[in-house]
């Protein structure tokens, strides 16, 4: 059995001028390589603005093995963040879409976040005294995505800064 992790020559050999090896479709290592290197570094489709017309409307997807939450804000803007609690990483929502009046609440420890991902409330907050909560990532709220663009109603995002194209429209205007 061929090992593809850390073996770029073996991966390149999967594509021939007249055929593609079946491992590209069924091999777990190839799948992991795609998740790790491709989906997190390129623009991905998250949904359409028509799916979240009202404030508090949200859609969730898993892209590149990461849970994503896209939310319409009260001012009409759209924010995207990771769909996982900042404390323990559990999913905040499990349905593919819905509406929240004002916040998202973790189903396990009830940490509560505003629709923009900022931390709203922590039960028994005094239990976190002397833990430097405000200095750590959890204390800042949900992990937001800085690379979010809409084009003709289509919502796209990118997780990493690698391969970042500052001119998003030039990248996609012919395809969309």
Regions found by a protein language model. Name each.
Residues 57-107:
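Glycine-rich active-site/cofactor-binding loop and its immediate structural neighborhood
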Residues 1-77, 112-176:
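Rieske [2Fe-2S] iron-sulfur-binding subdomain
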């Amino acid at each position: 059995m061929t090992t593809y992790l850390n073996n770029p020559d073996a991966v390149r050999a999967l594509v021939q001028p007249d055929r593609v090896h079946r491992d590209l479709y069924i091999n777990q290592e190839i799948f992991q390589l795609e998740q790790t290197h491709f989906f997190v570094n390129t623009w991905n489709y998250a949904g359409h603005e028509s799916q979240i017309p009202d404030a508090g409307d949200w859609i969730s997807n898993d892209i590149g093995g990461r849970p994503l939450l896209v939310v319409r804000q009260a001012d009409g803007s759209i924010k995207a963040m990771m769909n996982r609690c900042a404390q323990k990483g559990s999913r905040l929502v499990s349905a593919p879409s819905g509406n929240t009046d004002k916040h998202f609440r973790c189903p396990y420890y009830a940490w509560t976040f505003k629709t923009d991902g900022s931390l709203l409330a922590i039960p028994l907050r005094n239990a976190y005294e002397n833990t430097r909560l405000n200095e750590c990532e959890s204390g800042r709220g949900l992990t937001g995505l800085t690379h979010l663009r809409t084009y003709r109603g289509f919502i796209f995002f990118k997780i990493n800064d690698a391969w970042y194209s500052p001119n998003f429209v030039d990248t996609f205007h012919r395809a969309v």
